[in-house]
Design a protein with these regions (language model features):
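Conserved N-terminal phosphate-binding loop of PLP-dependent enzymes in the Aspartate aminotransferase
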Residues: 1-406
């Protein structure tokens, strides 16, 4: 709540599609969409119908439904990994695959990208200090151990830094987004992702790709779009239409290795899974969302609108010669307070301007638009319209004009 702009948070009354209404009756165009949790649009009809039906048939029984097989097959088709396990969130999915990676490699450490976010996973709240040492990020409260015991941090797009981190021979896994989305959008440079894959193979390190946000590029995320071959893939949020859920996929080789190493009689003490993981309600939501909402046709529309949104922002920035820029990732776009697009998480973090950001968010809110409060990101959903995007472009242009005049 503290991240929202203004003295008081907006309390929501109801939301549908690309809009929501607050308790005072004000209507907003939603470009935040629950920070991707509602990338489907709020309460998509197909997902709501599936939830209603399943709620009457049983919410959870700690046994699989037919939807488990249907959803697994759909995920395999989209992302290219044959086997899937379900969790309650993408955070849990990341926790579980880190544990599996340590089991499979016999190694203790993971590599993460500076200024990454993968949910509330203890090992990921690390950054680099001024001399390149791994330290806890500011605000990381109650860390169970010093972060340099569990983690090595590497800058995004730094292939030499990645090899240096892996060369110690003690890294179980690399956990990364294929494009950074939680410190602003930072895109991979040509050849970077392919080089990371090759380094993971060279040093016997497991590659985990987190597609929770980068699914904005299409039905199979950047994994399908770039032809990536991760060992594990994690995702959550949007695939359930807003119902808490997560999942992780794995290669057949990984699955076979796990089967050989995990003893059935002690599997419930392995730190993997949860009583509500893969419950019937969340699987019904995933099936309906993947089948009827996050479709090729809807992604095609959303990506066109994402381009239109970014073009509108770029036009205003150019017209008023502001030292800003705009990055885009499929259906997602972001204003950046710097003329040069960031190459690393540190670049993106250093381009931040807290007071300007607070003003911009509050101004957009007063003009009837909600954007993601942690930075300046906007996301399109199947219900977003060209008129919504053009209205934002007009409001953004007016704001830029007033800032220049001031």
């Amino acid at each position: 709540m503290a991240k929202w702009p203004g003295a008081y948070p907006v309390f929501i009354d109801q939301a549908k599609g690309a809009r929501f209404t607050d308790v005072d009756g004000n209507s907003y165009i939603d470009f935040c969409l629950g920070d991707t949790g509602s990338m489907t649009g709020h309460s998509p009809d197909a997902t709501v119908a599936a939830i209603r039906e399943q709620a009457g048939k049983g919410i959870t029984a700690m046994l699989p439904t037919a939807d488990a097989a249907i959803v697994s097959a759909e995920l395999a088709n989209r992302f290219g990994l044959p086997l899937w396990q379900f969790t309650v969130s993408a955070t849990d999915a990341n926790r579980h695959v880190i544990r599996y990676s340590r089991l499979l490699t016999g190694r203790s450490k993971i590599v993460v990208i500076d200024r990454c976010y993968h949910g509330s996973v203890d090992e990921t709240f690390a950054t680099l200090d001024a001399i390149g040492n791994t330290v806890a990020r500011e605000g990381n409260i109650g860390a169970p151990v010093a972060l340099d015991h569990t983690t090595r941090v590497v800058e995004f797009n730094d292939i030499a830094g990645m090899e240096k981190a892996l060369a110690h021979g003690d890294v179980a896994a690399i956990l990364m987004e294929p494009a950074m989305t939680n410190v602003g959008i930072v895109l991979p440079q040509a050849g970077y992702l392919e080089a990371v894959q090759e380094l993971a193979k060279k040093y016997g390190t497991i590659l985990i790709i987190d597609e929770t946000h980068t699914i904005s590029v299409g039905p199979g995320g950047m994994t399908a779009d770039r032809g990536l071959k991760p060992d594990f893939l994690t995702i959550g949020k949007a695939i359930g239409g807003g119902i808490p859920t997560g999942t992780f996929g794995m290669t057949q080789v990984i699955a076979d290795s796990i089967k050989k190493m995990v003893e059935l009689e002690i599997i419930d003490t392995g730190g993997i899974g949860g009583t509500l993981a893969g419950n019937a309600l969340s699987l019904a939501a995933m099936r309906a969302t993947l089948t009827h909402v996050l479709t090729n046709e809807n992604f095609d529309r959303m990506i066109v609108l994402g381009t239109r949104w970014s073009d509108g922002v770029d036009a205003a920035i150019a017209e008023f010669d502001l030292p800003w820029s705009c990055n885009r990732l499929g259906a997602r776009g972001e204003y950046i307070f710097g003329k040069i697009a960031p190459v690393t998480g540190a670049d993106a973090n250093n381009s931040g301007d807290f007071e300007l950001e607070q003003y911009l968010h509050l101004r957009m809110l007063n003009d009837g638009f909600l954007i993601t409060p942690f930075h300046n990101m906007a996301l399109m959903c199947p219900d977003t319209t060209s008129a919504d995007v053009d209205a934002h472009s007009a409001a953004f242009r007016k704001m830029c004009a007033e800032l220049v005049e001031a």
